[in-house]
């Protein structure tokens, strides 16, 4: 018995061993934190968890990353849309809530997906656990986001064949009934699209355009939305391109809003002049969601910038030493090329994603590069023209709530004689809620434009006469 007790270590020996072990552990932990980068530590920890889980657990985990083969992972997107419906009964100490409704700060906040929190779902009696993870990165995107979906190993095939299909269909149904559309702008500093609630109330009902144009456009949009099988059968990407052109103030932006509200599509508003190069353009455009509108306004400005860059490049190439090709290449990597843009309009990259509408707007169609106007490049060219008698009456009905007035006939005659945009007419109609006052002001405005037009014509004719007399005197 004494021999047995003599083999038991003393308390001081145990405490000394514990102290030494703690010191070694603290030293090792300090070395890891100071020397090994955070990303590598997270990677090692993740691999260790995966390794031990595969041997000692009966669970199986699907990893669903945000990006997949250069584009947004549609399974990740479906999970983002679907999982908030599973949050109502979530038993956790935290819940992500928020609202982007700027016009109604008192609106009820919506539920978001919290990071590193388990979300429970059940599918045909199968227990599923979702977790959203986020890891910082120094690449194009400031963070890497991915979901873990965990289930029992025996249900792996069932989840692959049935659950993910159910997930996609559920997300599509939710998106088709969503309350708010969003408009996105690209934040270069954070390398990501940022959104705001899109609450433009223009619809095809309130849009003041000629009825034939309206009907043609609505029919075209409806056919496009139902044309998945058709586009697949003819081997074309499921997309549609519209070129809106015409003078400023003719309603191009309102037309875009009406299209978005009719189709229930989000809008991605891209300022193309700010894109650094074709590589960034590819990254930006492939990150847009399906069932969306890519809007590039004033495309002629982007074309002008492209031509200026090409001209400058030729001048610089001619004056630089041939022995510094790398320096020349680096100098001109800023700015996109027209070919890079066209690749996404109808080139190979146009097949990335589906059910997308591309809209270009311009005030000067004649300034566009001919490559943008070739047949098949933009499917529909829509002239947004000056105000017509029909558009005038539509605007009066909207703003003054009247369908007839004694001033209608003289104003319609003036509209046919003088070029005026719908924006100019609207501005005059909004000057007063009284129809008599507003229409009288519009008539005076058009009369003044007519007089000015006559004066300008007289000055121009006098100038031509003087030029002719000068030439005759010289001869």
From Swiss-Prot:
Which ranges does the record mark as transmembrane? Answer: 11-28
Q: Where is this region: Disordered?
A: 306-328, 453-475
* Recorded catalytic activity of this chain's protein: ATP + H2O = ADP + phosphate + H(+)
Top-level taxonomic group = Eukaryota
Query: What is this enzyme's EC?
Result: 3.6.1.-
Q: Name one GO biological process term.
A: cellular response to potassium ion starvation
Q: Name one GO molecular function term.
A: ATP hydrolysis activity
* Positions with a binding annotation for ATP: 246-253
UniProt entry tagged with the keyword Transport? no
What is this protein identified as?
AAA-ATPase At1g43910
Source species, please? Arabidopsis thaliana
